[in-house]
């Protein structure tokens, strides 16, 4: 199954090629390092696994080697199975009846944009701030 992920190129443009490459690095990395490679070490996993991944454009192998192009790939690679905690917190936030819809409408697009589409790391673009506010709201609303 993992070999199919590594070898199967899909027709795409350069931007989506980079995005898919980052997800492939994350999937290969989590199978080899289930506890992750450590904070801000995506580049190490990228360097180790990039030659196992087929891409459409040679330039793809050189792009977004530090930030993974999206925070989901970066989180999975760097934190491994501990990234499931992120998924748990996100689902808890989404389905909580104690958190006002206004907070969800404000926070979720910002979090999902950086998580799935384009994110330049945890400390850029407000990702960590949005995430901290989300966690605060989860626990603050549950204590009332």
Give the predicted meaning of each segment.
Residues 90, 106-115, 120-144:
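Transmembrane alpha-helices of multi-pass inner-membrane enzymes
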Residues 1-2:
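Alpha-helical transmembrane signal-anchor/signal-peptide segments
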Residues 74-112, 140:
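Hydrophobic transmembrane alpha-helices and their immediate junctions
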Residues 39-41, 83-86, 128-129:
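Short, flexible micro-motifs
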Residues 9-79:
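Long extracytoplasmic/lumenal interhelical loops at the membrane interface
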């Amino acid at each position: 199954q993992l070999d199919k992920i590594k070898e199967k190129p899909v027709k795409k443009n350069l931007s989506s090629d980079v995005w898919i490459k980052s997800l492939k690095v994350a999937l290969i990395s989590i199978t080899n390092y289930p506890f992750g490679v450590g904070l801000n070490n995506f580049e190490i996993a990228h360097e180790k696994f990039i030659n196992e991944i087929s891409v459409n454009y040679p330039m793809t192998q050189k792009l977004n080697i530090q930030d993974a192009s999206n925070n989901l790939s970066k989180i999975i690679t760097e934190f491994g199975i501990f990234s499931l905690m992120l998924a748990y917190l996100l689902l808890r936030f989404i389905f909580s009846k104690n958190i006002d819809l206004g907070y969800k409408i404000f926070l979720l697009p910002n979090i999902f944009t950086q998580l799935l589409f384009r994110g330049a790391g945890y400390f850029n673009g407000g990702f960590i701030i949005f995430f901290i506010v989300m966690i605060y709201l989860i626990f603050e609303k549950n204590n009332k």
